[in-house]
Amino acid sequence: MTAESQQSPTRATAAGAGLQQTSGFTMPVVKVEKDPAPEASMSNGGSEVDDTHKGRRRKRPLQKGKPPYSYIALIAMSIANSADRKLTLGGIYKFITERFPFYRDNSKKWQNSIRHNLTLNDCFIKIPREPGRPGKGNYWALDPNAEDMFDSGSFLRRRKRFKRTDLTTYPAYIHDTSMFSPLQVARATYPNTVYPNMTMSPNYSQQIAPHSSVYYPSSSPAFSSAQPRVFSINTLIGHSGSEHAQPPNRSISPEVNSTSSSSCNYGGSAYSSQAGSGTMLPRSTNPVPYSYSVPNSHLQMNQSTYTHSNAQLFGSASRLPMPTSPPMNSDTVDFYGRMSPGQYTSLATYNSNGQLGGTNAYLRHATYSGNMERFVPAV
């Protein structure tokens, strides 16, 4: 039995080999490989992820401990928690650093962002500091129309960007009238005369009224025609054109004193009486007519005269009375209003004794002839 038992394994193996050969089936051969390293699998997976997300922008990783509020929300939060609903820039910094330790421990770069958001967003208003309150910097407040800028009072979600459109809601931008609107002026009548010791006739004040209305439009019944005269180039051109159409008839009656009677007839400005310390020079009181020749009409005007009670003109103290000059001849005037003086036949001259004599009078130059009147002014 021992021999049989010893030969049994060989028989069993031989029998197994015979069964395999007789049956014709072969066992499959499987090649076993070692598992790959985990680092290699992660690197391959990372490359695939990079290939898929190659065109996308990489999202900035969130910093640990940073609050989820925007800078606008931080500023609005600090202003809302202040007592006066306004804070300076330093007060905003102080509130943020006390409430959120992240901004206290990190660098100060966020302060630049706070300043930019204050100046670039319309929801914040700069308020100047009052003179009585010492300190540095202006105040910042939240716009009244931007108080509902955040949804349901939450500083995490903000609505559409606020735009300031209506300037009438702010006291600093309120204007009563536009700067380009015409100025409405109403002045009372000047009670006194324009010049001392002289009275102005009513027709003269009525004639100068249209010129003053150019700069002072009438806005109330208090506006009268006796306003101060304001002249410009347009009014003077228009006034000169009206003078060519009709002769001026303005008159001012000066009253020097109660005893002396004087009259002044002219078309221009007014002269006030002046007290001279010298002797008086006599002059004729008769007006000398002279004419203007205009392209379409011929105007007759009277020369301006000023008469005193004793028919003398004021002169210096070292001069002697001079006799009246003869009347001027009627001379034509060119288109620009220049007239050559007439010929004086007898002018008073000084002799060797210092007295005035009527002989050897000097004559003024004769009337210019031809076209020289347009270029040579009267002497």
UniProtKB/Swiss-Prot annotation:
UniProt cross-references to SUPFAM superfamilies, sorted A to Z: Winged helix' DNA-binding domain
Localization annotation: Nucleus
Disulfide links within the chain: none
Leader sequence segment: none
DNA-binding region per Swiss-Prot/TrEMBL record: 66-160
A GO BP annotation: anatomical structure morphogenesis
Domain of life: Eukaryota
Major localization listed first in the record, in broad terms: nucleus
Gene3D superfamilies the UniProt entry points to: Winged helix-like DNA-binding domain superfamily/Winged helix DNA-binding domain
Official protein name in the record: Forkhead box protein E1
